[in-house]
Amino acid sequence: MAEPGTPILVAVAWPYASGSRHLGHLAGAYLPADVFARYQRLAGNRVLMVSGSDVHGTPITVRADAEGVTPADIVDRYHAEFLDAWERLAISWDCYTSTGTDNHAAVTHDIFLRLLEKGHIDKRTSEQFYDAEADRFLPDRYIGGTCPHCGYLEARGDQCEDCGRTLDPEELVDPRSKITGATPELRATEHFYLRLSDFTESLGAWLDGREGWRRHVLNFSKGWVEEGLQDRAITRDLDWGVALPVDDLGEGKKIYVWFEAVIGYLSAAKEWAQRSGDPEAWREWWEGDDARSVYFIGKDNIPFHTIIWPAMLTGYGGLNLPTDVPANQYLTFK
């Protein structure tokens, strides 16, 4: 139980601005977070509840392609819909924003450059899937296939929604392009990588010290570390996303969504501070020794919040890691 007056960051999953939210989203992340935030405010704690629309995910470009409109058209439609829904549900945000702001890009660039400077990001040439019929490289969500771990036939190129494992597209069995249905080929391309392997020991020790976490969250996270953390590409061959703060890779590259979306919790806190009239106020929730941070997400986002984001925070230095990540299971109807 937090002492009265404790700064508590309530960090809530960022919905893709690619489609309407459903009951599972509300029950899994948004209503629990709002109940928790309201209780903590009544208990006398200083709550900062933040989230926003994720406007750079490939589900957005996939939908835009299908409808024959621009990604910005899709984003504008669903961001407005989300804002209306939160107002009607009376969700008590302190800051609900989007990853499309100049502020978010600036905070993302700051973290990218610090990690690059400290050697936790490096540049590599790798082979990625290319659709010769469409004449383009394929981001993860533009590829489907069979999960190599559980055999699920409709796995995505970034994750299997059946077993929850994150994937690299080249791991898929019988991969296919979602644009043309063709079998993609591997071609060389240059990208920046986050050296997750640098944090194996520190994250393992941190997870061992977590108390009160939900068992499925802790076991899943520890399993990642025990299997050995793999370095992951953090840029993609895309024209929709946060621009790189360096020009090493040339044209046609963007920071990939899984790297920059989690930074939204920090950029939203900074945006709130700027709006409040004290641009440094965010530090109370992110740097204070007594501060707590609780992340409300669905189970499919566990590794991004218990492995990747803590690794980024550790590498950056001076920012608080999550206190708890009470990820919910999927809501099912029978």
Segments predicted by a language model, with ranges:
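Structured secondary-structure scaffolds
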Residues: 2-51, 98, 103-107, 150, ...
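Anion (oxyanion) recognition and catalysis
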Residues: 41, 87, 116
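Short, charge-patterned binding micro-sites
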Residues: 53-59, 63
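A charged helix-plus-loop insertion that forms the helical arch/lid used to bind
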Residues: 63-76
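Aromatic/His-enriched, Gly/Pro-containing loop or helix-boundary segments
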Residues: 73-77, 93-106, 132-150
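A glycine-rich helix N-cap at a beta->alpha junction
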Residues: 79-94
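Hydrophobic or amphipathic alpha-helical targeting/insertion segments
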Residues: 105-123
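Cys/His-rich short segments
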Residues: 119-191
